[in-house]
Regions:
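Short, structured coil segments at secondary-structure junctions
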Residues: 65-68, 76, 172-176, 229-230, ...
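Asp-based phosphoryl-transfer active-site loop
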Residues: 12-27
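Short, acidic loop-to-helix structural element flanking the phosphoryl-transfer center
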Residues: 27-45, 89-96, 105, 137-139, ...
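Non-catalytic pre-domain segments flanking phosphatase-related domains
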Residues: 1-16, 36, 40, 209
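Short active-site oxyanion
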Residues: 44-48, 68-70, 154-157, 212-214, ...
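Conserved acidic, metal-coordinating active-site core of Asp-based
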Residues: 103, 107-226, 238
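Active-site phosphate-binding/coordination module
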Residues: 32-128
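Mg2+-dependent phosphoryl-transfer enzymes with acidic/Ser/Thr/Gly-rich catalytic loops
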Residues: 9-13, 31, 187-271
Length: 271
């Protein structure tokens, strides 16, 4: 579903991924230099978040309030908001979802599912438990029957497992993109009808802004298409090598003032 409302003479777009682009996972904070850069950009640019998160969820809303973006490409392009208005949304095909759940259920080494309404609907929850405990020291999820997912409104799914398994899933289901996370221990599973890049295109259409007047920052493979599509695509210094190769420019890492340094390099702000 898409709402069309063209606005003229809007400011150029600067788009940011959240995790390990703005938000440093080492201490779960946004560096001061990045926050200062966002504040300087605000006067002359439209600030967009393009993320695999649902920024309206209780898990992410504090970050949204801290960053104060003009628009958000949520859940890898399956939901787009401008202010509090949803201008586009796409729900995962239910029959395809059933097929993916059945496929993953036969592989005990991986897990696939989604989190909806405070519950986590995953096959092989022990895989998710181990993944979360290894990364964060604990797993606080509330697991539920994954076969209930097709009865719910789901926009994207998540894969927990290694890169080989993610590639196999992508080959088995050509209708989806399986984009590995930066740590290569999991991936977003998104229907090809939606992506961060398509979200950027839809926002350009909404605001009547040419793609050439956009800048996109990212660090992982779910940023690949938006970095390639934007007028200027920027990979963080901590980004995956494939993304660095695709980018127009590689800046410093998230914890080394990468956001600020790239914005200064391209003349978006002055020190």
């Amino acid at each position: 579903m898409e709402k069309r409302q063209v606005r003229k003479n809007m400011k150029p777009i600067v788009s940011f991924d959240v995790d390990m682009t703005l938000l440093d996972h080492k201490d779960w904070t946004i560096p001061d230099s990045a926050m200062e850069t966002l504040q300087r950009l605000r006067e002359n640019y439209t600030i967009v978040l393009a993320t695999g998160r649902d920024m309206d969820s209780s898990f992410s809303v504090v970050l949204k309030e801290q960053i104060r973006p003009d628009a958000i490409i949520h859940l890898n392009g399956t939901k787009i908001t401008v202010g509090d208005t949803i201008i586009y949304e796409h729900l995962f095909d239910k029959e395809l979802m059933r097929q993916i759940i059945a496929y993953a259920q036969d592989d005990a080494a991986c897990s696939v599912g989604a989190s909806v309404g405070g519950y986590d609907y995953y096959v092989h929850p022990e895989v998710v438990n181990r993944h979360d405990t290894d990364l964060w020291g604990e797993c606080g999820r509330r697991f539920a029957d994954p076969w209930k997912l097709p009865d719910l409104d789901v926009r994207t799914m998540a894969y927990i497992g290694d890169e080989k398994g993610a590639k196999a899933m992508g080959a088995r289901f050509p209708e989806v993109n399986v984009h590995m996370f930066a740590e290569k221990r999991g991936a977003d599973v998104v229907e090809k009808t939606a992506s961060k890049a398509m979200g950027l295109i839809r926002l350009c259409d909404y605001f009547n802004i040419p793609l050439s007047s956009t800048v996109a920052f990212g660090d992982s493979m779910n940023d690949y298409d938006i970095v390639k599509t934007a007028g200027i695509g920027i990979a963080m210094g901590n980004a995956m090598e494939e993304l660095k190769e695709a980018a127009d420019y590689v800046t410093d890492a998230v914890d080394s003032d990468g956001i600020r340094n790239a914005c200064v390099h391209f003349g978006l702000i002055r020190l």
